Amino acid sequence: MRVCLVYDCLFPHTVGGAERWYRDLAERLVADGHEVTYLTLRQWPRGARAQIDSRVKVVSAGPRMALYTASGRRRTLPPLVFGLGVFLHLLRAGRRYDVVHTCSFPYFPLLAAAPLRPLMGFRLVVDWFEVWSRSYWREYLGAVGGRIGELVQRACARVPQRAFCFSELHARRLREERLNGPVTVLRGLYGGIAEPAAPRRADPVVLFAARLIPEKQVTLAVAAIALAAARIEGLRGEFLGEGPERAALDAAIVEHGLQGILTARGFADADTLDAEMRRAMCMLVTSRREGYGLVVVEAAARGTPSVVLAGEDNAATELIVEGVNGTIAPRPDPESIAAAIVRMHEAREAIRESTARWFAANLDRLSLESSLGKVLESYSR
C-alpha cells in the first residue's frame, strides 16, 4: 500500500506526542512492506537528511520556519505555507497514494487535501488529537480570530474522512462538530518499556516534565509545590523541559524562595527522564489542555503515580483512576494541587504498587501497537 503521512513536524527534529506518533507510524508501515512518503516542513539543515528510517521517503513541502512565537503560541504563516505545499504536492503526485493520513492540526493541510481527494482517488484518514472549544479559541486568538479559527476547525470536520481521536473528550467534541465520517478512539500511544518496572521506594520528589508553554501552567506548579513542601518534610521539585515559560519558571522559584528545593534542569535526554520518573514520588501534570496525557502512562510504567489537574480541555484525566494510579486536583489553584501532592505522599508504597498493577493490567490497551494495528486495518476498508 502507498501511504502519504502529512504533518508539519518530524521527530526528533521537533519533540512532541504527535511527532512521535507519526514517526512510529511511518517506521511501522515501512517495516510491514508498505511504501511511505512523509510530507513535512523542513526542520534540518539544508543538504542534511532527516533522521528517520531510510526506507521512509521524506518530502519537504515548505522551508524551515519558526513554528512558535516568543510566547509559545503557533504562528499563522507556517500552516498556510505548509498547506500550499501539501496542495501542490498532492496535485502533482496524489494519484500515487492509496491513503493520505494527516493530522487535523494545523488545519490548512487537511483543507488542502480535501478537494483533491475525489480527483486523485486516495482515502483520507485524519487524526484529531484535540478539538478546541469556542471559549478556548477566543482565549487563544481573541474574539474575531477565535471565531475564524472555530469556523476553520468546523470546516475540517465536515470534510469526508476516516477519523481517529485519542480521548473520549475530543471524540465527543468532534461528533458535535458534525463530523463527516466515522471516528474511532485510539487508547494506545505508549511505545516504551513493555514490562512494568518493579516499584521502588520513592524519593520525596515531585517531577514536572513538559515543554514550558503557557498551557502547562508552570508557575502554578511551583506555587503548589511550595505549599506542599510546608507539609512534607524534605520535599523537592524537579522540572525537566524548555520553552518560552522558562524565565517565568526561574522567577517563580525565586519568588517562592525555593532555590534550594526546586531545580529546573532544562531539556533531559531519555535516560535522565527514565531515572527521574523511577525515583519520583509523583508526576505533576498542571496542564490545562491535553489531547491525551502520555506522560501519565510513561510514569505509571515506572510505578510512579500522577497528579493531574481537572479542566474542561484536559483529556489526561481520562487516564487517572482515583487512588489507583494517581489523583485528580479538582481546582486550578495551588491549595487544591498541593493537597493532591500530599495525598500521594501519604499513600506511600501502596499507591506505587497499585500504579504498577494498573499499568500491567492496561498495557495492551495503552500500547502503541494496539493503535497502529487499528490504523492499518482502516487503510484497507
Question: Which residues does each predicted region cover?
Answer:
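Membrane-proximal helix-turn-helix segments that form the acceptor-binding/catalytic region
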Residues: 91, 115-119, 126, 132, ...
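Conserved donor-binding/catalytic core segment of Leloir-type glycosyltransferases
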Residues: 164, 198-225, 238
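Nucleotide-activated donor-binding/catalytic signature segment of Leloir-type glycosyltransferases, i.e.
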Residues: 248-268
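Aromatic "clamp/platform" in nucleotide-sugar-dependent glycosyltransferases that forms part
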Residues: 288
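Carbohydrate-associated surface elements
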Residues: 169, 188-189
